[in-house]
């Protein structure tokens, strides 16, 4: 991922994202209001990535409903983003951004 895209993501997210994703072959995410405060998906997926020697990482992305459209637009332009999961209340709103 380019540093500019990383910086753009950092501006709209409410949590810090690790710079380690800049060096990953790919990354995934759990998107919601505050998955950084307790979502266990990153723990599960990151241990799987490590076990299978994948240079990948799942990160939580805390985003407001207001910034969800911006986030989805940014993620579509990042080749190393390979998908992920979404929590309520974003789960219903995010459907219109998925092809």
Indicate residue ranges for each PLM-predicted region.
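Short N-terminal or domain-adjacent regulatory/targeting segments
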Residues: 1-20
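Phosphate/diphosphate ligand-binding glycine-rich loop within oxidoreductases
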Residues: 23-99
């Amino acid at each position: 991922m380019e540093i500019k895209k990383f910086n753009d993501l950092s501006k709209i997210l409410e949590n810090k994202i690790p710079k380690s994703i800049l060096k990953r072959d790919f990354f995934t995410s759990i998107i919601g209001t505050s998955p950084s405060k307790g979502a266990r998906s990153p723990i599960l997926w990151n241990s799987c990535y490590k076990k299978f020697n994948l240079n990948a990482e799942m990160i939580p992305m805390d985003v407001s409903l207001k910034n969800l459209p911006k986030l989805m637009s940014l993620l579509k332009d990042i080749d190393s983003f390979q998908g992920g999961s979404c929590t309520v209340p974003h789960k219903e709103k995010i459907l219109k951004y998925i092809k």
